[in-house]
Amino acid sequence: MADMKWAVAHIKSSFNNTIITVTDITGAETIAKSSGGMVVKAARDESSPYTAMQMAGQLADQLRDKGIHGIHIRVRAPGGNKQRSPGPGAQAAIRAFARAGIRIGRIEDVTPVPHDGTRPKGGRRV
């Protein structure tokens, strides 16, 4: 198993869309990518768990064709001033990769967290 080829799946999941990009280990070369709009046509369905499962299944097939059998996963939420928890598609995509027979190495959260950044939107509350 030492000669098994690995890749990195970057899952950006918000409540409006889910985007999955698969790169090589260094992150330099994009191997495959998919977004909610490439799978469903209704905008309201782009972030759904079903759409994320379909995307992950398609990407798993592409990875197998290219000889990649294992992935490390980096989950990202909108972050910054916005939501710090990933949308509904993130967990569904991870489970779909596992069910498709792709080995999963590390799972890490790479949501950007501000070190006291800009002022959040909304009025002042007293």
Curated annotation (Swiss-Prot):
PROSITE patterns in alphabetical order: RIBOSOMAL_S11
Record Gene3D superfamilies: Ribosomal protein S11
Tree of life domain: Archaea
Key words of the record: Ribonucleoprotein, Ribosomal protein, RNA-binding, rRNA-binding
Matches recorded under InterPro entries: Ribosomal_uS11, Ribosomal_uS11_archaeal, Ribosomal_uS11_CS, Ribosomal_uS11_sf
Any single GO BP term: translation
GO molecular function, one term: structural constituent of ribosome
UniProt KW Disulfide bond keyword: no
Assigned GO CC terms: ribonucleoprotein complex; ribosome
Coiled coil: none
Pfam families given in the database record: Ribosomal_S11 (PF00411)
Family designation: Belongs to the universal ribosomal protein uS11 family.
Description of how the protein assembles with itself and partners: Part of the 30S ribosomal subunit.
Function: Located on the platform of the 30S subunit.
Name of the protein described by the UniProt record: Small ribosomal subunit protein uS11
UniProt gene name: rps11
